[in-house]
Amino acid sequence: MLNVVIIGASGYAGAELALLVHKHPELNLKGLYVSAGSQDANKPFSALHPQCLGLVDLPVKPLDEAGMLEAKTGTDLVCLATAHEVSMNLAPQFLDAGIPVFDLSGAFRVQQDGFYDKYYGFTHDQPEWLAKAVYGLAEWNAEQIKKTDLVAVAGCYPTASLLALKPLMEAGLIKADTTPIINAVSGVSGAGRKAAIGTSFCEVSLNPYGVFNHRHQPEISYHLGGKVVFQPHLGNFVRGILATIYVQLADGVTAEQIDAAYQQAYSHSPIVRLSKQWPSIRSVAGTPFCDLHWQMQDGLLIVGSAIDNLLKGASSQALQCINLRFGFAPTTGLM
């Protein structure tokens, strides 16, 4: 079995990943860590996440000097569920020790000059590792994932959006010089576990945010290979993403061509489900699936895409990438 360390285990995505690793027949959850100054350090993991009581009762250790040495010793792979700049600094320390890294943050997703200064507020000082990172969208980058030691797990909104749009782009079905519009809503868990007024029970509603400046818009455009308009919304539910995407089709595109594009992309993918009805968050919450459905009329295509933001949008996608990298069946530990 492979020994796995998770850093950033106190957050929602880290908790989901710990459960997935615990259930995986080929993985052993060796250690859970948080930053040295975290108030969660030295607490039982199940005290932070009661749903894990009796399943994952390991202590959450501080990643101080001794913790880092322990985290590197006898470890086969590391998962980072940490803040973006923290991941940028931590990943090379493990990679230089020969330990593959699966990073759930945005620190290594986009290889574009000035991107991190503009959208993340810091200068990326690991250009060599950034250039080597493989984007962890499992259904589209499987062969590259198998050969890399640094996987930048795709973001939650980008996963829902790209799985819907890439088959159309690859098949040349999107009208030239037009811009797909992505209207997406996410549950409040996407904002993380840290308390904030805007995500408190009494305050949360349904509202747009990040208008024209959300960092996932350029991530989507970069990995799609074309411009998009992306507008996220915060919903008054815990988990899940529902994206409704509007696409102008190239002249003469038929329903048969659209169906063929999606079938070619996903007929052998058990994680992406081509549904006969419009997807809902209820259908995917707590699962690793992405549900897709589409309808066309008068040259306009509308695609619905639903995922669990903490699973397919984060932890279960990371596990898919781990399965690919280490030669396990793609759905091991997921289905």
Swiss-Prot record:
Keywords: Amino-acid biosynthesis, Arginine biosynthesis, Cytoplasm, NADP, Oxidoreductase
CDD domains for the chain: AGPR_1_C, AGPR_1_N
Name of this protein: N-acetyl-gamma-glutamyl-phosphate reductase
Top enzyme category: oxidoreductase
Gene Ontology biological-process annotations: L-arginine biosynthetic process
Protein purpose: Catalyzes the NADPH-dependent reduction of N-acetyl-5-glutamyl phosphate to yield N-acetyl-L-glutamate 5-semialdehyde.
GO cellular component terms given for this protein: cytoplasm
GO MF entries: N-acetyl-gamma-glutamyl-phosphate reductase activity; NAD binding; NADP+ binding
Family stated for the protein in its record: Belongs to the NAGSA dehydrogenase family. Type 1 subfamily.
Gene3D superfamilies, per database record: Dihydrodipicolinate Reductase, domain 2, NAD(P)-binding Rossmann-like Domain
Keyword RNA-binding part of the UniProt annotation: no
Reactions accelerated catalytically: N-acetyl-L-glutamate 5-semialdehyde + phosphate + NADP(+) = N-acetyl-L-glutamyl 5-phosphate + NADPH + H(+)
Pathway per the UniProt entry: Amino-acid biosynthesis; L-arginine biosynthesis; N(2)-acetyl-L-ornithine from L-glutamate: step 3/4
Cellular compartments annotated: Cytoplasm
EC number per UniProt: 1.2.1.38
Top-rank taxon, per record: Bacteria
Active-site residues per Swiss-Prot or TrEMBL entry: C156
Pfam families: Semialdhyde_dh, Semialdhyde_dhC_1
UniProt entry tagged with the keyword NADP: yes
